[in-house]
Amino acid sequence: MAFQPTPLRVALVAGEPSGDLLGASLLGGLHAQLPASSRYYGIGGPRMTAVDFDAHWPMEKLAVRGYVEALKHIPEILRIRGELKRQLLAEPPDAFIGIDAPDFNFGLEQALRGAGIPTVHFVCPSIWAWRGGRIKKIVKAVDHMLCLFPFEPELLEKAGVAATFVGHPLADEIPLEPDMHGARIALGLPDSGPVIAVLPGSRRSEIELIGPTFFDAMALMQQREPGVRFVVPAATPALRELLQPLVDAHPLLSVTLTEGRAQVAMTAADAILVKSGTVTLEAALLKKPMVISYKVPWLTGQIMRRQGYLPYVGLPNILAGRFVVPELLQHFATPEALADATLTQLRDDANRRTLTGIFTDMHLALRQNTAQRAAEAVARVIDSRKPH
């Protein structure tokens, strides 16, 4: 890149843990691609701040899920967005990168783009799955979209939005053949015997809704498969405290409750019961049979159902274009149904071999050196705006 008389300034906003992961990966690529004097600032989490990012607000202020649940947080979120917009318009960065969080970022990006600031959005919203009307917002707000999945650029380019498929950083990070033995040693689990990882979500509201159902399902599974062990990773210390009463309420369960280490827990497992989200892709990259589930409040569920297009919600099924693992959602997510489906995934060796092949192909398709590709695309956007 040509010499810069003043340091480049790149503003970024990530709104939840998955965005923090993507942001940290992208920052690693930007540090290698852009001049060493470049500054990176905005809103991010601990992973981003660990790689020379100046967080003006903590990411947790934006990490609110669902329509109804977000209502009480709207005033503070709008205040933060207004303050950030004023800052960025007063001192324009060389580029703005919104990382996921479309409900927060698109309005901000539209205002910045209108002022001539280049806008990049990292993670295409699921316009192919639901809320397809957001393509109109993307056209107004985004100069360039960085896409995690290979089918997305074509959809965007048809609407006139420049886009680059960059792959997924998890596919770069996770080995093609995960080390189950090492993961079990790390967790103090025996090398033999069935292990099921149970992941009821990374937010308090998710765990409160589905956690009791998951633990009731675990109790049923242990009755039917007496040698089974469970490992439940809690994303934060606060969530561990929330999960501990569920463990205490099932004293006969053979369960290991860990803090963090979700990937280690899934690597150690023979099968996974998981709440829908990015973690389902992680489970697929680890080549694990799984059952995907979620429960949301009734009104949120009704809104989502009316705006949905695809018959599935789990990323492994979306990427495969068909059901390759079962999904049990809302009122279908009973302890009995979850236990039956998870034990089937645990015991069916032929299905395990089939899934290993499907998930290996998926892994190879998404392994694209995401940090470098994304950073190169950002550098091109910045370079295209400089006077030549």
Curated annotation (Swiss-Prot):
<comment type="function">
    <text>Condensation of UDP-2,3-diacylglucosamine and 2,3-diacylglucosamine-1-phosphate to form lipid A disaccharide, a precursor of lipid A, a phosphorylated glycolipid that anchors the lipopolysaccharide to the outer membrane of the cell.</text>
</comment>
<dbReference type="GO" id="GO:0009245">
    <property type="term" value="P:lipid A biosynthetic process"/>
</dbReference>
<comment type="similarity">
    <text>Belongs to the LpxB family.</text>
</comment>
<comment type="pathway">
    <text>Bacterial outer membrane biogenesis; LPS lipid A biosynthesis.</text>
</comment>
<keyword id="KW-0441">Lipid A biosynthesis</keyword>
<dbReference type="GO" id="GO:0016020">
    <property type="term" value="C:membrane"/>
</dbReference>
<dbReference type="GO" id="GO:0008915">
    <property type="term" value="F:lipid-A-disaccharide synthase activity"/>
</dbReference>
<keyword id="KW-0443">Lipid metabolism</keyword>
<dbReference type="Pfam" id="PF02684">
    <property type="entry name" value="LpxB"/>
</dbReference>
<protein>
    <recommendedName>
        <fullName>Lipid-A-disaccharide synthase</fullName>
        <ecNumber>2.4.1.182</ecNumber>
    </recommendedName>
</protein>
<keyword id="KW-0328">Glycosyltransferase</keyword>
<dbReference type="GO" id="GO:0005543">
    <property type="term" value="F:phospholipid binding"/>
</dbReference>
<keyword id="KW-0808">Transferase</keyword>
<keyword id="KW-0444">Lipid biosynthesis</keyword>
<dbReference type="InterPro" id="IPR003835">
    <property type="entry name" value="Glyco_trans_19"/>
</dbReference>
